[in-house]
Amino acid sequence: MDCYKREIETLLRSREVSGFQLLDLQDYTGQGTALVGVLNAMMENKGLISAEKWREFCAGTVVLGEFASFTGMMGEDIRFDVQISECDPEKRHTRIRCTLMDGERELYACDVTPGARQGRLTDAVSVTFPAECYRDAMQERITGLTVVLTLEDGTRNHYPIWLIPPIDIRITREGIEKDGRMVAFVSAEEKADGAAIVVPSAEGQLPAEYCTDFWCYPMFRSISESMGKPVPVGTMGLSIDTASPLLKRFAQEDYTTPAWYAILQTAHVQRLPADIHPAVQMIDNTERCARLGILYQQDGVWHLTARLWEKPDDPTVRALAWSLWEALK
């Protein structure tokens, strides 16, 4: 649903398009089996999202937030822009309520006046939440908060964000070092002596990329093969065991969030036997249906396919490294 939201909101922010078409709102059983719908083939809700949440970003009136990043450092102000997409030419809006929430607890709120309207879309207006407003919500781990935008008629939208504490940690090709203690990166299980994590070779493996299956993987695979083009990766996003001790200080959602984006850019997926249940795995398409691991335990040794040393200064990479170090030191 996050991919749908991003796609639709990108279109709504553009003054160059007058509308869009979803292909399709329901699962489609022709041209292969396309399980792409928010609804099933009988037009019933599949439980992925409620109708109310769907209409936050797909409706005649949508209040839009635009963020440079959905992750940030604790102690920094939260900055974003707001706009309104309004299809009714007679309807006018006078206020956007911007609220920062920690679960059900309101941390900060302010009102802004919408920008000048040109056609369907208003001009963007900048909003800043000062760092002091969320200080009481901070934890010794990545902290998830929510920005809620509300119009005077009750129209609302929301955006999860993740704030990362400063971490005194060193990430190199050799391993993760903190407080004089090292968790080593090794290339094979037989080298995993003491505090170590195996980083297997990416040779012959799929990259840790994914794209929502907007249609049908077998059809696009066969088209790519017939045209001599690269075959789509065909993976569908992460499934995460949030109870894993290795993720105690990291993001606690059981699906892909922006906290994982930089990490996945350094990773591949490892084909595994079906009896291994990874802490972090990539969901495969229904045709290939392989067990694809990113963080998993095999023969009593933890493996991680992400090469964290490639992005040692990225805050989310450092946060994951900290969580791994805490569990394995």
What is the predicted function of each stretch?
Residues 134-142:
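Surface-exposed, short loops/turns at beta-strand junctions within beta-sandwich domains
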Residues 27-34, 101, 107, 205-207, ...:
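Flexible loop/turn segments at secondary-structure boundaries
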Residues 161-185:
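Low-complexity, Pro/Ser/Thr- and charge-rich linker/hinge segments at domain boundaries
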Residues 1-94, 278:
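Substrate-binding clefts and catalytic carboxylate motifs of secreted carbohydrate-active enzymes
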Residues 42-56, 146-167:
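Short, structured interface segments
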Residues 76-115, 122-129, 141-152:
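Beta-strand-rich binding/interaction modules
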Residues 179-222, 230, 302, 327:
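Short alpha-beta junction capping motif
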Residues 221-315:
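Catalytic beta-strand/loop cores that center a nucleophilic Ser/Cys/Thr
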